[in-house]
């Protein structure tokens, strides 16, 4: 969602990018507009002319124009539209949308434009690229669309496809922070990427960048070391995404998706509960992971590691954990949204579990009561 005022809007309006199920007729998603927050009207053609598009990923207001990008396609990968294009309109009420970029910024391996944000008078866009790693592009949106875009970071910040996707973008203290991830929770089986934990980089207005959280490595700009001293995933292998970042009361927050809670259900054989990890050409990693899980036990992994991580920093380099166990609920696998308000800092969790959950017993899988299932909203206030 975003607040935007176009030429035909008498005042700022709320614009929303919803999700349209293919089961409801398959007409494609539409951008919605609301003046009062109660009534919403469509202001875009279904799927921008593509009935297979069920939703849009980002919705950004920049220089009096509204930008968005489709993120999926019915019958295809969860994050692969028919064309990875940024769309723009100068007046949403006139229902006139045009391509603001060439498909994939000229790279067919850019499967989607995953996130966008405004920083330093430019629009930044981050992609999902399972072959070479994410790319970050920027434009000043001058002239007529499609606009001229400039690459800022390529090849997953020289980590390759282990930085498959830009998942989160947040402006903080005159710099742009990028959180990475691998689709499907840190392990992309379709493209055989990962498993691997996520990183954070920091981009400056002059397009130079720092590695904040991640793996040290050589780059075309010299060797990069994580300025926080923390490895990928804040040192937690299970943190497959930096899913959301936000600012509140002078602090930068980063929330993760932690897939450790899914271990008992991931590629498990009900007979011996061994885990056959597909590690994208890294058989030694898969074997080591299997041995680790077997020695510790998947239930103990969930007990001590289950639940998202939330970290905060006042300078973007020194980080402190707020929680590493989903606020005590292992079924809170991810931080899905953050909102700073005068009343405090709101956080919404991703918790896909229901009122019952499957538990392994000597007799096999059994469903038991699970009062911790379902999404939660938390409010943080200064003490």
Write out the residue ranges for each language-model feature.
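Trp- and S/T/G-rich repeat-edge/linker motifs of beta-rich repeat architectures
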Residues: 3, 9, 13, 22-55, ...
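Conserved beta-propeller blade signature
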Residues: 13-17, 65-69, 122-126, 175-179, ...
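Short, well-ordered, aromatic-rich surface patches in folded extracellular/luminal domains
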Residues: 351
């Amino acid at each position: 969602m975003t607040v935007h005022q176009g030429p035909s809007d008498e005042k700022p309006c709320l614009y929303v990018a919803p999700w349209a199920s293919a089961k409801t007729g398959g007409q494609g998603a539409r951008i919605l507009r609301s003046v009062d927050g109660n009534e919403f009207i469509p202001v875009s053609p279904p799927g921008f002319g593509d009935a297979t598009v069920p939703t849009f990923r980002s919705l950004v207001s920049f220089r009096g124009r509204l930008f968005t990008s489709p993120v999926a396609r019915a019958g295809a990968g969860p994050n692969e539209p028919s064309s990875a294009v940024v769309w723009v309109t100068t007046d949403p009420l006139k229902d006139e949308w045009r391509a603001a970029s060439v498909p994939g910024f000229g790279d067919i391996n850019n499967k989607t434009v995953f996130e966008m944000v405004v920083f330093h008078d430019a629009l930044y866009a981050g992609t999902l690229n399972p072959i070479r790693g994410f790319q970050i592009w920027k434009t000043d949106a001058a002239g007529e669309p499609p606009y001229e875009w400039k690459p800022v970071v390529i090849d997953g910040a020289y980590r390759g496809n282990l930085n498959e996707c830009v998942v989160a973008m947040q402006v903080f203290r005159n710099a742009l922070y990028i959180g990475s991830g691998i689709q499907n929770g840190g392990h992309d089986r379709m493209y055989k990427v990962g498993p691997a934990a996520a990183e954070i980089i920091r981009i400056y207005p002059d397009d130079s960048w720092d590695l904040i959280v991640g793996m040290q490595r050589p780059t075309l700009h010299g060797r990069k070391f994580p300025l926080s001293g923390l490895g990928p995933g804040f040192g937690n292998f299970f943190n497959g995404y930096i899913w959301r970042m936000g600012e509140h009361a002078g602090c930068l927050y980063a929330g993760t998706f932690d897939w450790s809670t899914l271990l008992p259900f991931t590629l498990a054989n009900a007979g011996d509960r061994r885990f056959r990890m597909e590690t994208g050409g890294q058989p030694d990693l898969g074997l080591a992971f299997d041995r680790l899980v077997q020695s510790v036990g998947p239930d103990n992994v969930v007990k001590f590691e289950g639940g998202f991580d939330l970290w905060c920093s006042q300078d973007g380099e020194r980080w402190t954990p707020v929680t590493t166990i989903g606020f005590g609920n292992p079924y809170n696998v991810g931080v899905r949204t953050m909102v700073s308000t005068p009343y405090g800092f709101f956080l919404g969790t991703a918790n896909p579990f229901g009122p019952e959950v499957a538990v392994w017993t000597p007799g096999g899988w059994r469903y038991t009561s699970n009062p911790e299932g379902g999404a939660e909203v938390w409010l943080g206030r200064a003490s």
